[in-house]
């Protein structure tokens, strides 16, 4: 809230200027893999459950990590596709953590199960972001996979049970905008403290939303 009294005090007794600081380095969102176990209808990378050519090997990823460190990049968000489909994802993540990066994991959450949660917790990701784009019916329609919502929410709960910082990521389009208040209620009900809200990247399969979203905002 803007307070005129505070503004007047600042005019009469300005706060001393703080020393200039170098701007922080960029956050790198790294799509390590295009493969995904889901085929979301709004996916910008047109991911699918198949192998795609031209992806980096483990050693090539390590070389890029060295380059990013030399460039003083402080934070990495490991994404995809579905990053948990990379067999070397935990090796890569541990390497990044050992190098001093802030390391986040951006996932659809369905692969956070009894077989993977131990490794996820051992890596100690600084943050796990799980995409939820509506309540059960809407989310499953987006994902084109019945049961995806429940699988993702189980992933959220497993992360919390293992002491990981976890939050929801919501991409708003004309198809799910009306459910935003219910998503906020879900955050409260599940005691989830972090929420990332974004617009759609109009690329790949998400390009078909360009016209309807523009009309919705008019």
Language-model-detected regions and their locations in the chain:
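Radical SAM enzyme [4Fe-4S]-AdoMet core and its adjacent flexible, acidic
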Residues: 1, 102, 122-123, 131-133, ...
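Conserved alpha-helical substructure of the radical SAM core
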Residues: 2-127
